[in-house]
A protein has these predicted regions:
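Intrinsically disordered, low-complexity mixed-charge segments
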Residues: 1-7, 11-14, 23-24, 707-728
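A short macromolecule-binding patch
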Residues: 94-99, 160-166, 649-665, 713-718
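Electropositive polyanion-binding surfaces
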Residues: 32, 171, 181, 186-188, ...
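Charge-lined substrate channels and their catalytic hotspots, especially those that engage the 3′ end
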Residues: 1-283, 290-336, 374-375, 671-672, ...
């Protein structure tokens, strides 16, 4: 039984059991009452088992099915390295805390049944795991350690706190220091450790590339494409055929450019821009990937499974094979390419007066880089201007229109968090040689503004057509978090207006503008960001809080994001007159799962990208132990405070390293205060730190504060002395 059918039948049977005329009955009795054929009674049992597992239905002492009285809840367990955990229950506003003594063998990501504790106090609900319904993890990436008679594997993920016992005959010949994939064969109970077997040796911890591959395996990121998919891709032509171009709007004589990073290979968006009188005509042309990825094909199934391309520090794990993403789907200069275009007429106030969405064929004139466009528009580089002289007027118009669009967006309340992204430079061996903030300049902003307006325009168009669609939504912040933020910023003389338990994004935008350039900017910006919710994919257009718009979608990157590819299919069905009732019902049935899965895969990719960045930052700072840097306090907790350096590297100053006083954490003001000296360490404060230690396994960096009255050279000597005592 497929997932959709199971959900449908679960609802039907649950409604039947909840009916006031229902009397408790056994499965066989229920089958007779509901006229379920004998051949389908196994499916009825499957549905009843699922309802029981969900905690919605219970079996009485007489074996009869009754509605659960709420004694049990079902959810997913999230473990903490210190032993306790939380269970996320659908429909519950907050996660339920599970003390370490009440986890009863549950491991990270397990689906569990819990009961609420009677002694739950305050706002936090507590519970006890009563049953493990299903295991969430079958394999783990570990560091293998071999002893004389057995081996054990230490999970990379600190949320799996127990080592896994691994008999030598199941170790695949692993030696100490090998990164391995371990399959759990016995999850252990009553204090017994889990047992497992090595199913893959990734490489030795000291081998180049092993560190990144360990993260890839740890997040279960699919690297290779199957032979079936590669054979399917081999049949795709390297050139656009006349048949493919037939019936499309021909824009090949329009002056067209792509603007991307120098190392980008999958070019999925191109731009055209003209101006007649008071109206700009902006064309955003997106690679027509759906022409080459047929719905429900092996390639499409794999693309949906992946959900997104993953951009790790040293490699890209693509959603589509490179032959497509870098070849026929990439809008390479001088080549005929199929596109889906959103052509907008925009007035001088940034209003979209009219628009056309069409299947097109384009030919890019020049492949531009952000650096080149920046040199032309900001640095007025003579050589670059001469090289691209026929395009310079269009670039000037782009700068002009982007500024208009940005001004309009900001006027309505769009929030722009200008936190620096990281660019990590690696050598040929994969070692980090430089770390710096990513350059956000006039060229990157032009593309950002043009993609945003295209995404908004497409979303609004399909919202009013009332067709099935996938939107990109961002819910309003949690009221309690916003109120807490409002209380905190009062300490600095700032206020935000919260009306009827809701806040308008313009209030947060005005706050960010007020704090721009102030000492408390980093502090308040981070707290504002933390008060907001995550954006996600949905089938209902509930608006995008951060962009202050009622309509938004992801239309512009079908090479690397599945939701974009999905809505391209919907748009083309509509343009071709195929959106009949059958297709509408089809999309209504599949889109909720597409949206949910795509959101999950996006979060997985983001986490993997963050972990590889953290790993390389640790590796970079490992070579700089003993060096002094100036940074800004970026986070304060009871165990210490975090310091971010100008190159975006972040490390912890542990409270135990602050030896000049006894410091306590003041949660209301996010600062550490010395009891004797009254010395303060607070968010946004500049401090000098020395690199004390690094840990590649935990991906952490330890800093120590350098006193203002100590010269850097002396600080290095003092630190070297401390380190030698620690390691002696």
């Amino acid at each position: 039984m497929n997932k959709e059918l199971l959900q449908e039948r679960k609802k039907m049977i649950y409604d039947f059991i909840c009916d006031e005329l229902y009397v408790p009955m056994k499965a066989k009795e229920m089958a007779i009452v509901l006229n379920v054929p004998k051949s389908q009674r196994g499916e009825l049992l499957e549905v009843l088992d699922a309802l029981t597992a969900d905690g919605k239905v219970e079996i009485s002492g007489r074996g009869k099915y009754v509605k659960s009285e709420g004694k049990y809840l079902t959810g997913v367990f999230t473990a903490h390295p210190r032993g306790f955990g939380f269970v996320t229950v659908e429909g519950e506003e907050e996660d339920i805390f599970i003390p370490a003594a009440q986890t009863n063998g549950a491991l990270h990501k397990d689906t569990v049944q819990i009961t609420l504790s009677k002694n739950s106090s305050g706002k936090r609900k507590e519970g006890t795991v009563t049953k493990i319904l299903s295991r969430g993890t079958e394999q783990l990436v570990c560091t293998y350690e071999k002893s004389k008679n057995f081996g054990f594997a230490v999970p990379d993920n600190p949320r799996f706190a127990q080592d896994i016992f691994t008999p030598l005959e199941r170790s695949k010949g692993g030696v100490s220091g090998h990164k391995v994939v371990v399959e759990i064969t016995d999850y252990g109970k009553n204090g017994k450790k889990p047992e497992g077997k090595v199913v893959e040796i990734i490489g030795h911890i000291n081998d180049p590339g092993t560190d990144i591959m360990s993260i890839v395996k740890g997040y279960d990121l699919p690297v290779e494409f199957s032979q079936k998919i590669m054979k399917q891709v081999e049949n795709v032509s390297n050139e656009v055929s006349a048949a493919d171009m037939a019936g499309r709007m021909d824009l090949r004589d329009w002056q067209t450019v792509t603007i991307d990073g120098e190392d980008a290979k999958d070019l999925d968006d191109a731009i055209t821009l003209t101006k007649e009188g008071d109206l700009y005509e902006l064309g955003v042309h997106i690679a027509d990937v759906s022409n080459y990825v047929q719905e429900s094909s092996a390639l499409d199934v794999e693309a949906l499974k992946r959900g997104t391309s993953v951009y790790l520090v040293d490699r890209v794990i693509p959603m589509l094979p490179h032959k497509l993403s870098n070849g026929i789907c990439s809008l390479n200069a001088g080549e005929n390419r199929l596109a889906l275009s959103c052509i907008m007429k925009i007035d001088e106030k940034g209003n979209v007066i009219d628009h056309t969405i069409a299947e097109t064929v384009i030919k890019v004139d020049r492949r531009m880089s952000y650096t080149s466009v920046k040199k032309i528009l900001e640095e007025h580089d003579v050589a670059e201007i001469e090289e691209y002289k026929e395009l310079v007027p269009m670039f000037e118009r782009m700068k002009e229109l982007a500024a208009i669009l940005r001004k309009k967006r900001m006027k309505r309340g769009s929030i722009d968090f200008d936190f620096p992204e990281t660019k990590i430079i690696l050598d040929e061996q994969g070692k980090p040689v430089d770390i710096k903030p990513y350059d956000r300049n006039v060229a990157t902003k032009i593309i950002e503004d043009f993609m945003l307006i295209a995404n908004e325009t497409v979303a609004q168009d399909y919202f009013w057509q009332e067709l099935p669609f996938v939107y990109r939504t961002h819910d309003n912040p949690d009221t309690e978090k916003i109120k807490k933020l409002g209380t905190f910023i009062n300490n600095f003389g700032y206020t935000i207006h919260i009306g009827q338990d809701e806040i308008h994004p313009k209030e947060l935008q005005k706050l960010l503008m007020k704090i721009d350039g102030t000492p408390e900017e980093a502090l308040i910006s981070r707290l504002t960001l933390r008060s907001m919710k995550q954006a996600k994919y949905t089938t209902v257009s509930t608006g995008h809080f951060g962009l202050a718009t009622n309509y938004y979608c992801h239309f512009t990157s079908p090479i690397r994001r599945y939701p974009d590819l999905q809505i391209h299919r919907i748009i083309k069905d509509n343009l071709r007159g195929r959106m009949n009732q059958k297709r509408i019902e089809h999309y209504d049935s599949i889109l909720p799962e597409v949206a949910k899965h795509s959101s999950e895969m996006e979060r997985r990719a983001d986490e993997a990208e963050r972990e590889t960045d953290k790993l390389k930052k640790v590796e970079y700072m490992e070579e700089r132990i003993g060096q002094v840097f100036e940074g800004v306090i970026s986070g304060v907790q009871e165990w210490g405070f975090y310091v971010e350096l100008p190159n975006t590297v972040e490390g912890l100053v542990h409270v135990t390293s602050l030896t000049d006083d006894f410091y306590h954490y003041e949660e209301s003001s996010y600062e550490m205060i010395g009891e004797r000296t009254n010395k303060h360490y607070k968010l946004g404060q500049k401090v000098k730190v020395i690199v004390a230690d690094t840990d590649k396994i935990m991906r952490t960096i330890d800093f120590r504060v350098v006193r203002d009255d100590v010269e850097p050279d002396e600080a290095v000597k003092d630190e070297a002395s401390v380190l030698s005592k620690m390691t002696d």
